[in-house]
Amino acid sequence: MVELRDLPELHVIGWTNVNASGEPYPNLWEFVFGELDIDAKFDSITSKVQDSGCYLGLFQNRTSVPRLWEQAAWDHEFLLAVEVKQLDFIPEGLVQKTFPASTYAIFTANGVPHSAFQNTWNHIHNEWLPHSEYKFNPDGVFFIQYTEKSGPNDERFEAHLCVPIVKK
């Protein structure tokens, strides 16, 4: 099932997956929840919209939905962020970004993350987009809205894949 929704401009504060040398972190999630301690950084942002532990994974400058089960998808302009009401306090090591308003097709991925992402991607690319009146909007930003059920390797995993769209 898909939900179509017009979303307003999106203001976020987040962390970009590049180290000091400009290379992506090879152990992304270990670094984020270990050394970086992203939970503490995000919890210090008083203007955030999401609950603690609920994040946005934004994939910038894409022309289609990335293959999320492949590491390369996370290596290129990936931003782990929280939506904020205002861009006031930005913790050290984080950046602020604003993305334009867009219409989105929102799909829910359920199950163990690897297969949930793959199954949802297959549905989007092989069934929904070809048979809908929409196409991917490269002027928007594809993002994952992680929920409180978004633990790694957890069969109860749930996340929303938000695909920017325009009429064909």
Task: Give residue ranges: language-model regions.
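A solvent-exposed interaction/effector surface
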Residues: 1-168
